[in-house]
A protein has these predicted regions:
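Alpha-helical transmembrane bundles and membrane-interface segments of multipass inner-membrane proteins
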Residues: 1-221
């Protein structure tokens, strides 16, 4: 592809992934009740609506406002760095399609989850049913309320919406306590899937090139 075609592909792919990611998240958030589950393919994958304060696949990064700020700033810096690298690769090199696609997938996924944290607190009201990973406090009527220091809302403080979950389980005869348990229990979204595919593509296709300088050998296709 020419540089113009590469630029068009990168921009169009990023916009498409971001659109799909945000469309699914907003649809689930406005249509599902907290923790509501709907089977997509029985025994394989389902929709299960949750929100998380952490990283990809619901991984936690501390349990407070400063941890959330740190994670959001890290995401922002990572996106800026990846975006700068993507632009540099297109303008100064001739990346093959697989490498370009991998960087686009990683950038799109990181940007998709950052959008949640940046803007969702402005677009949606805080749902107190999603405080399971934060401190729950109860008033005299046994109703949940949230002290300011536990869950502040605002720019960079929104939760990430997750919804996809594989329901495939290990055979009952599996050792080490795996029998009957889910093979992949984390709940994820399109942004997480995009990042995982991008990283996986890099590892599969370019692992032999890691650690080599750019002038030693071009990336293999």
């Amino acid at each position: 592809m020419t540089k113009k075609q590469q630029s068009f592909f990168a921009i169009a792919s990023i916009l498409l992934i971001l659109f799909l990611d945000q469309w699914v998240k907003i649809w689930v958030k406005t249509s599902f009740s907290p923790y509501q589950t709907v089977a997509l393919i029985q025994g394989f994958i389902e929709l299960h609506f949750i929100e998380n304060r952490g990283m990809a696949f619901g991984t936690e990064f501390g349990a407070g406002i400063w941890a959330k700020y740190a994670l959001s700033v890290f995401r922002l810096l990572a996106i800026i760095g990846i975006g700068y690298y993507l632009r540099k690769v297109i303008l100064t090199q001739n990346p093959n399609f697989s490498f370009l696609l991998a960087i686009v997938l990683i950038f799109s996924g990181a940007a998709g989850n950052l959008i949640d944290g940046m803007f969702y607190d402005f677009a949606f009201d805080l749902d107190k049913d999603f405080l399971t990973n934060w401190t729950r406090t109860y008033d005299e009527n046994n109703a949940v309320f949230l002290p300011d220091e536990v869950r502040k809302t605002g720019f960079m403080l929104g939760s990430v919406v997750d919804m996809f979950r594989f329901t495939v389980t290990w055979p009952s005869w599996m050792p080490f306590g795996l029998g009957g348990g889910e093979i992949f229990p984390p709940i994820w979204n399109i942004a997480d899937f995009s990042i995982s595919c991008g990283v996986g593509l890099l590892l599969l296709k370019y692992r032999k090139n890691f650690g080599k300088s750019n002038d030693e050998k071009p990336l293999e296709n």
